[in-house]
Amino acid sequence: CVLEKSAEIGGHILSGNVFQTTALDELIPDWKEKDAPVKVEVKKDLLKFLVNEKLSFSIPSFLMPTMQNHGNYIISLGNLCRWLSEQAEALGVDVFPGFPAAEIIYKDDRVAGVITGDMGVDAEGNPKDSFQPGMEIIANEATVFAEGCRGHLGKELIKKFSLDKGKDPQHYGIGFKEIWEVDNDLHEEGLVMHTNGWPLPNDTPG
């Protein structure tokens, strides 16, 4: 089964994406016939260096061959996740949106599953009339954690099993996501634009 803390699958995935279909071709070879939300093929890549908020100049594409996306698609990751959940459910996978994993179940010092969060509690964590305790989900073979690099269960696992012993320290960056609605006259379908420079200072790459 799959547990998703968001109220709907893909609800926390606000990212657009330039998508290479290799893995999807292997996983679901007939994804086009199944109307996957992978429609807009990349037609052109532009590379821009931003000097400031008004001035930029183009970088020849041959200087950065890894930035070329011929044959790839421009997609919404959230929409793709929703579609993948439908394919999984059609195969008999139980998908539970709105059920975050809250605790780890251990058996013989191994991960055996998780317990979902309690439902029907107030802001202070006190049970309301609609209270329902979390459910135990026991895995048949394996439990896969996909909660991000600093999830609370991940931190518990790292500490318990010394997963960071002898490893380089993790590094983090802060990212901000926004969804913009752009007038059709102001964008070109199939265009991928890569930028660097402003607003970052010269001594900060990105």
What are the language-model segments listed below?
Residues 1-55, 60-206:
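Residues forming the flavin
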